[in-house]
Amino acid sequence: MLKLTILGSGTSCGIPVIGCDCPVCTSTDPRDKRLRTSALIETGEGGTILIDCGPDFRQQMLRLPRAVRPDAVLLTHKHHDHVGGIDDLRPFGWPDAVQIYADEDCADDVRSRFPYSFVENKYPGVPNLELHTLHPLQSCRIAGTEVLPLPVMHGKLPILGFRIGGLVYITDISALPPEAVPYASGASILVLGALRHKPHHSHETVEEACALAQRLQARDTYLIHMCHDM
C-alpha cells in the first residue's frame, strides 16, 4: 500500500518568512511552520520516491528514521525551492548514483546548477547523480512502480505533476491542461498547490484549487505550497 509523507507544504520563502512579523509568521501553532514543498512516497513495492528536493531537504530528512533513503527523485520544475537541495543528496549516492527524473528543461537546469556532479572526472564526495528525461503523459517505471508525468502550467512555464497509483501530486499550478484532466481524475489522494486567497499570475488560489479538486473528484484532497497569507 502506498504511503505518502508531506515533508513540506510551504511556498518558496518557507514559513515563517525571514524578518516577517505577520500573524502567521509569528504564530506558535506548529501548522504555521512550513518547510519548502516536498513529499516522500513509499510505494508499497519496496521503493521510496522523493518528489522535489528543495533547500530544506536536509532538515526534512533529519526528521525521518535513518533507514529512509530515496531510491529516486522526481522533480516538478526548475525553481530553486524545488531543486535547491540537490547537493544534499550526496549521502545517498553510494554505491549507486541517485536517480533523478525531470523534464528536459529542468534536467538542463540541474546540470547547470550542479556541473561538478556531471563532469567525467568528479571530485571525491560530490553528489553522484544520474539524470533521466521525462515526457508528459509517457509513463515509466521508477523505483519499481509506474509513474505517469502530467502536464501542468505554472504561469507561462510548463512543469510536471505526477500520478503514482491512486496518488495525484500537483504543485505550483496555475492551470491544468485539458489533456491531463482524465489522468488526474478519480484519485484516492490528490495533493494540490494553493498559494493563497488573493489571485496570483502563476499559482492557483485556494478557491481555484478547491474548484479543480471538485472537477477531479479525488477521495481526499490536501492543499500544499501555501504562503504566509493563511
State the predicted function of each range:
Residues 175-230:
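Cap/insert and terminal regions of metallo-dependent hydrolase folds
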